[in-house]
Amino acid sequence: MKTYYIDTLKDVKKIAKMLDDINSPINKNNATLLHLCSIMSSDTEPIEYLLDIGANPYQVDIFGLNSFDYAKRNKNPIAGLLIYNILK
């Protein structure tokens, strides 16, 4: 099984393209990728990219959490970036 990392913009673009090729609803996939970046990404570029291509930070997962919740729970500093991008 191949391991994918989501810490750089290049990696996130590669995964987003792969999810696009699977034929799943694109906004849902990008929102899931945004959830993962909210937890693990130490760079803001992947998050800005996902927001620019239409990832919905309000999309909730099966646990009822959205990207804001994940960023706050994991004390990831990108929570402020997410909120800023939504409000601008």
Task: Indicate residue ranges for each PLM-predicted region.
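Leucine-rich solenoid repeat scaffolds
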Residues: 60-88
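Ankyrin-repeat boundary/"N-cap" motif
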Residues: 1-5, 25-37, 60-66
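Ankyrin repeat domain, specifically the short helix-to-loop turn at the C-terminus of the second helix
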Residues: 14-22, 48-56, 84-88
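Short, positively charged, low-complexity/disordered linker segments
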Residues: 31-54
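Substrate-binding/catalytic groove segments of enzymes
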Residues: 44, 59-60
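N-terminal cationic amphipathic segment used for targeting or macromolecule association
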Residues: 14, 22-23, 29, 53, ...
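Ankyrin repeat A-helix N-terminal signature
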Residues: 2-10, 36-43, 70-77
